[in-house]
């Protein structure tokens, strides 16, 4: 299901048999209708970014709910898919902050230790937040709690009111939080643009003696 170290750590923050409940939920959801992302990509964020390599978290709310968009990484879409509005604004801020990036697929961020996690890992087709409050929040809250226990610093990038509520789980003074309004068109001009999260993240990592992220890769 996930990278084994993630699995063992996450389980310690969940009720007994919670993984079984998740699997039952997934069986029913995928049998009853069209759900994104593809089932094999539900836990992709944890599969491609091992716990021991994670140094940044970018928290999204739930997967894109349009055809072929969601790929299991927050805000990312496959290269051949047009960038949704939030991703357009993320790339615009990146261009203003560090430089232009033409790729819509953010997998190269994930491979550098940037955990691209959504709070809900599935969504029914065409129904934003359709699986909110059903199964995922205790699981993804546990992921944040696992990161909070890390001895090495993690930069938590929290965009929007929903993500910022998760600050309650980040109590370890070794870690750093960068927060701003959400990059969606509704809120991007209220403080997301100009917030420079990418250069600020690298400045923190380098100050901590860690390698910065090549955001343009």
UniProtKB/Swiss-Prot annotation:
GO terms for cellular component: cytoplasm. PROSITE patterns: U_DNA_GLYCOSYLASE. It comes from Streptococcus pyogenes serotype M4 (strain MGAS10750). The active site is at residue 62. GO terms for biological process: base-excision repair, AP site formation via deaminated base removal. NCBIfam families: PRK05254.1-1 (NF003588), PRK05254.1-2 (NF003589), PRK05254.1-5 (NF003592), ung (TIGR00628). Keywords: Cytoplasm, DNA damage, DNA repair, Hydrolase. InterPro entries: UDG_fam1 (IPR002043), Ura-DNA_Glyclase_AS (IPR018085), Uracil-DNA_glycosylase-like (IPR005122), Uracil-DNA_glycosylase-like_sf (IPR036895). This is Uracil-DNA glycosylase. PANTHER family: URACIL-DNA GLYCOSYLASE. It is found in: Cytoplasm. It is an enzyme of class 3 (hydrolase). GO terms for molecular function: uracil DNA N-glycosylase activity. Belongs to the uracil-DNA glycosylase (UDG) superfamily. UNG family. Excises uracil residues from the DNA which can arise as a result of misincorporation of dUMP residues by DNA polymerase or due to deamination of cytosine. SMART domains: UDG, UreE_C.
């Amino acid at each position: 299901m996930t990278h084994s170290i993630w699995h063992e750590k996450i389980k310690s923050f969940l009720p007994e048999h919670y993984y079984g409940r998740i699997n039952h939920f997934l069986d029913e959801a995928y049998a009853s209708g069209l759900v994104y992302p593809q089932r094999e990509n539900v836990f992709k964020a944890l599969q491609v970014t091992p716990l021991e390599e994670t140094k940044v978290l970018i928290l999204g709310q739930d997967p894109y709910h349009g055809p072929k968009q969601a790929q299991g990484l927050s805000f990312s879409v496959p290269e051949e898919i047009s960038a949704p509005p939030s991703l357009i604004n993320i790339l615009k801020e990146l261009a203003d902050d560090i430089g232009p990036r033409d790729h819509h697929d953010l997998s190269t961020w994930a491979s550098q230790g940037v955990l691209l996690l959504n709070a809900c890992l599935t969504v029914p087709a065409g129904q934003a937040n359709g699986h909110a409050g059903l199964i995922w929040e205790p699981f993804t809250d546990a992921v944040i709690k696992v990161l909070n226990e890390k001895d090495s610093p993690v930069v938590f990038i929290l965009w929007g009111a929903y993500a910022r509520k998760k600050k309650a789980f980040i109590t370890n003074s070794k870690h750093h939080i960068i927060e701003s309004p959400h990059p969606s068109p509704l809120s991007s001009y209220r403080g997301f643009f100009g917030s420079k999260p990418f250069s600020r993240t690298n400045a923190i990592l380098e100050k901590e003696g860690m390698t910065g992220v090549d955001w343009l890769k």
